[in-house]
């Protein structure tokens, strides 16, 4: 759960500002930006993950760049080490990076869709009452965008905690996620389909609970706006 939580938090910290800034731009810029955000999603999931393996491996593009820039040599002089490359593949950081790269659009899209539909008369009314930009964001925009935030968190956390391809390809199989655990129960040496089915059912219940909370929260926000 830890890596999935970290990836979800990073996606939220990156995705919310991006969504908010996009909503304030012109329509032409927004369309172009959304195409660029969605462009990687048109590629196969495994191919996207393989590309990060090529970038992060010991002789990969990133380590070659560090060698050409002298960053590895500088690090060796400062620390007294004799590293030939930075170990980035088969680490927790690589797994989190793969999750963020693959699932960040799932955080941006629901938040953006909520913010772009906000009633601008509410923002204007808040400004007319003397609220500055920070207060308008904190008192109006943020509360009304929480349904999108909850939706984004659900859409990122659930696939992050259940994936096994990213943890195996970028983490070397050393980081065990729920997806890895379920796969082992059905296909691995620890054959226990009953346990695998139980874990899958628990994950499905978590998704259902999250959806119910989102719907309930969204109804509360709509009632608050009407009042």
Question: For each predicted feature, which ranges?
Answer:
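C-terminal transmembrane helix and the adjacent membrane-cytosol boundary/short C-terminal tail
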Residues: 112-123, 127, 197-227
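Membrane-helix interface segments
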Residues: 25-33, 91, 121, 133, ...
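Membrane-interfacial helix termini and adjacent extracytoplasmic/periplasmic loops
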Residues: 49-100, 134, 170-174
